């Protein structure tokens, strides 16, 4: 299961902003109850989306019952994730402290590294926050995600080449509706971006406005950019 920052089912996660949380420390070194954190991640993920596990910056990583857990914060943004048998923490999403309410996301971990995909062309270069790079190497996953070199084709009404996997994600998240809005999470647009996620991948002229205000080509390009940099695990249903 993987937490992220964008969607209804969308990885509540289309949202990706990275940070450095300092030196990693085992849970026992910080006086953290591993069993309690593991149970909270498995059975009450909403509470982890609403608030960090403790005040200030922290970087807690541990293995409990053959499952890896990671909880990080730089004092302003916080992330958490878990996955079975992973030697590295899954790609992580961040949430901005008092604002976004995020939903849990299933950890999608393939047995091979995801092939790099060619980024779709963009009319403007936007600055994207630095993101922690992690390699997914686990051989077991909650769902089987196969990023084969699937054929890419432009979405109807858009000149951006969107691979078939990302097209399927858009159908699950919004049915392809550019104006779709999730009333509970605030995720919006064809790919159900949270606002903080959208601002990290959208062109500068569309940052700070709802994804629903952007044309399909802009939404497609932003989703491709997020998919190529952070992977399909940004969507819960991916």
Curated annotation (Swiss-Prot):
As given in the record, the signal peptide range reads 1-27
GO MF annotation: an example = hydrolase activity, acting on glycosyl bonds
- Region spans: Disordered: 82-161
Q: Which domain of life is it from?
A: Bacteria
Q: Gene Ontology cellular component?
A: extracellular region
Residue ranges under compositional bias (Low complexity)?
A: 89-156
EC class name: hydrolase
The UniProt function text for this chain reads: Is able to cleave peptidoglycan and affects clumping and separation of bacterial cells.
Per the record, the similarity remark reads: Belongs to the transglycosylase family. SceD subfamily.
Protein name (record): Probable transglycosylase SceD 3
**Species the sequence originates in:** Staphylococcus saprophyticus subsp. saprophyticus (strain ATCC 15305 / DSM 20229 / NCIMB 8711 / NCTC 7292 / S-41)
Q: What is the lineage of its organism?
A: Bacteria, Bacillati, Bacillota, Bacilli, Bacillales
